């Protein structure tokens, strides 16, 4: 439906998204993020698998909490479809909508934390080989943890609005 609306706006001069013709540009933003946001969460899943393989192999241990890691990856993929509007806190969403997207976004921190702590537990007490792939994986863990912590802050719609258009968001 969204692509049809966009194509008719561009080719047949309809005004689904043009406010001058009674359209709603916020609707376009919802449609954009509804597609674009889950994509990001799905695209990171193979990267998680690569990090798990590197950490496990170069620590000489099995992945800690393997079943929990699988469930965490599935829940991240599913929850990614439910949080698109956390990129839209400044467009005038009502309080109840912002509260839902705040809570749903914060919930993603749980499976993400499971993954981080499982990777750390996999390395703990292992025979770690400090070669380039492992150093990359450890750097990823550090940056992903910082991104996750700043993401929890930005999940709060009130703080997100205050921090909008700042380097804090860029750093996240």
Curated annotation (Swiss-Prot):
The keyword Transmembrane helix applies. It is a multi-pass membrane protein. There is a cross-link at residues 37-41 (1'-histidyl-3'-tyrosine (His-Tyr)). It is found in: Mitochondrion inner membrane. GO terms for cellular component: mitochondrial inner membrane. The keyword Heme applies. Binds 2 heme A groups non-covalently per subunit. The chain crosses the membrane at residues 31-51, 63-83, 106-126, 134-154. InterPro entries: Cyt_c_oxase-like_su1_dom, Cyt_c_oxase-like_su1_sf, Cyt_C_Oxase_1, Cyt_c_Oxase_su1_BS. Heme a3 binds at residue 172. Its main location: mitochondrion. One of its GO terms (molecular function) is cytochrome-c oxidase activity. It catalyses: 4 Fe(II)-[cytochrome c] + O2 + 8 H(+)(in) = 4 Fe(III)-[cytochrome c] + 2 H2O + 4 H(+)(out). Component of the cytochrome c oxidase (complex IV, CIV), a multisubunit enzyme composed of a catalytic core of 3 subunits and several supernumerary subunits. The complex exists as a monomer or a dimer and forms supercomplexes (SCs) in the inner mitochondrial membrane with ubiquinol-cytochrome c oxidoreductase (cytochrome b-c1 complex, complex III, CIII). Belongs to the heme-copper respiratory oxidase family. This is Cytochrome c oxidase subunit 1.
């Amino acid at each position: 439906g969204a692509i049809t609306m966009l194509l008719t706006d561009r080719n047949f001069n309809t005004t689904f998204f043009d406010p001058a013709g009674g359209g709603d540009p916020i609707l376009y933003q919802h449609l954009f993020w509804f597609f674009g946001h889950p994509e990001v969460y799905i695209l990171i899943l193979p990267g998680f698998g690569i990090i798990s393989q590197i950490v496990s192999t170069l620590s000489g241990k099995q992945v800690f909490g393997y079943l929990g890691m699988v469930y965490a990856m599935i829940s991240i993929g599913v929850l990614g479809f439910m949080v698109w509007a956390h990129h839209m806190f400044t467009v005038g969403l009502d309080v109840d909508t912002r509260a839902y997207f705040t809570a749903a976004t914060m919930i993603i921190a749980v499976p993400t934390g499971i993954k981080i702590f499982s990777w750390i537990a996999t390395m703990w007490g292992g025979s770690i080989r400090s070669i380039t792939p492992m150093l990359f994986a450890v750097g990823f863990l550090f940056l992903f943890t910082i991104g996750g912590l700043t993401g929890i802050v930005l999940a709060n719609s009130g703080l997100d609005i205050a921090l909008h258009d700042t380097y804090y968001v860029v750093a996240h």
